[in-house]
Amino acid sequence: MKLADSVMAGKASDGSIKWQLCYDISARTWWMDEFHPFIEALLPHVRAFAYTWFNLQARKRKYFKKHEKRMSKEEERAVKDELLSEKPEVKQKWASRLLAKLRKDIRPEYREDFVLTVTGKKPPCCVLSNPDQKGKMRRIDCLRQADKVWRLDLVMVILFKGIPLESTDGERLVKSPQCSNPGLCVQPHHIGVSVKELDLYLAYFVHAADSSQSESPSQPSEADIKDQPENGHLGFQDSFVTSGVFSVTELVRVSQTPIAAGTGPNFSLSDLESSSYYSMSPGAMRRSLPSTSSTSSTKRLKSVEDEMDSPGEEPFYTGQGRSPGSGSQSSGWHEVEPGLPSPSTLKKSEKSGFSSPSPSQTSSLGTAFTQHHRPVITGPRASPHATPSTLHFPTSPIIQQPGPYFSHPAIRYHPQETLKEFVQLVCPDAGQQAGQVGFLNPNGSSQGKVHNPFLPTPMLPPPPPPPMARPVPLPMPDTKPPTTSTEGGAASPTSPTYSTPSTSPANRFVSVGPRDPSFVNIPQQTQSWYLG
């Protein structure tokens, strides 16, 4: 799981920013959504002591796992003071995340009743939670600790009543007689804590010791006079040792303090880190693709990656085909960086050896460029919407309709690609300028075609000659010496120009037969694919 580096804009009202912390599992992204009314209504009723208590237990557990010994009283007291003095914004952010988890675990039909009963607008009624796989009360982690979980009813009592319960105190909880489903009810007003005789007995002496400490040291209490140690033995009062660092009066005082006095959190937008799971679908997070070309190719790649990273969604432009004659997306194809990966490693740039296309051909460039990056499907009547088992590449959604700058690095063609091997063997310099050429089998039959963006769609190459046909070298004009093109095939004033005015545009391609060893000896001047 990765955290988003950017923060989405939100709304502010009543002088406080209302946000909830959201995480979408399918899209694997974090974002911030407007504060949910469930969290906004319950946040003022959460006790601030809950933040201190949960974090104190986590610190003690972490210290014990690291040092293999318990935290000393001085260290524990320092941690307690640090947590009590934490900023209200931090406490409210934590409470918002925890309330979001609780909302998820409460059945939808009981969420409104839960809010109304906690806020005092309705008499207490049962609020059922979603059971676990065994039909029992669910357990959640309150501080993103996978190894430390708390029962939902324990969390409710700590949050809304401020009772310092341990995670193992689930057996001490007692449901009210009015509760109709004690096994799954998480209504705080239906949950009580059982007090045993030992608790009552200890409460008296601990409270007496605490009250005696609050008095003036110069005036010792009567209990201190009676319980003076004799002959070095401990007094009766000293046999009760408190394991915590809270005194009785301090514990009662901090457990009654609300975490938020207002109707919403008051933390700033820049402090937000993450969110809970709410209400935004992955489709709502998608960025709409621009209709015109952008100046930054990085933004285009980022938007394409966002489209590819959301599984289980339909492509953006499914069923919205464009005719080759529509020139709304003709601009922008030449702005793609030449170093970007493409399925057949063919690079297209403005520095190509081809002449500039005529205005009549410009309308089909955007369509032809996008069609070039689609996977080639073999077969006489193959459909572009074939099953993934036919294509031999990952099943992530592929945008198949025309666009100005799509490049899918995840698509891989079959390693035994006849055209690729042929271009690398015969025409290494023209591998970047391959026109509309069919995939050739050993018997010369064509199985698929790669569209050339520099030619309109109606111009198709002639069928390949029979297997015994040999390539015919083209005549060269005697007036100009042959020179090789520079800058990746860029046209120069001294480059040779071949013209065949008597032939039609469809016959201006060199037709080649099956692979033959004699192809290696083809002269240099026959390596130009476009002859017009």
Swiss-Prot record:
The modification Asymmetric dimethylarginine is found at residue 412. It comes from the Eukaryota. The modification Phosphothreonine is found at residue 494. Its main location: nucleus. Residues 212-222, 282-298, 319-332, 352-364, 492-505 have a biased composition (Low complexity). Residues 24-217 bind DNA. InterPro entries: CTF/NFI, CTF/NFI_DNA-bd-dom, CTF/NFI_DNA-bd_CS, CTF/NFI_DNA-bd_N, MAD_homology1_Dwarfin-type. Binds DNA as a homodimer. Belongs to the CTF/NF-I family. This is Nuclear factor 1 A-type. It comes from Mus musculus.
